[in-house]
Amino acid sequence: LQIMFSSTNKPNAKSLSIKLQLPLAIFQRKEVDILETISRAFHNEKSIREYSIGKYRIDLYFPKYKLAVECDENNHQNYEILNERLRELYIQEQLKCTFLRFNPDDPEFNIGEPISKIFSHIVNYHSQL
């Protein structure tokens, strides 16, 4: 249980581990670190981590800009491609949103790229007002 609570990114895991009096070691995942960096870069903008839509969750969602951000660690190798595409289409249909995906495990990954794309999306939104 300790490993499960320590490695999850579910918001209630920490409080539950405290109630169960389990020592909690923090093992941050790459996804968590990167999404926190992105959230800090846009701290003046409302963003929601693990945003739920139907049976799905979005890693990071900017509701004002209808922008879904997905961190695809290892290109989501454990996910079936068709199911992942259907998930994305469902979310886009429900939220009328744009998807931004990036893979932090790509050797060419640079945190500046998703931050720049989010910034461009926000600027584009404001220019159309």
What are the residue ranges of the model-derived segments?
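Nucleic-acid endo/exonuclease domains
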Residues: 1-129
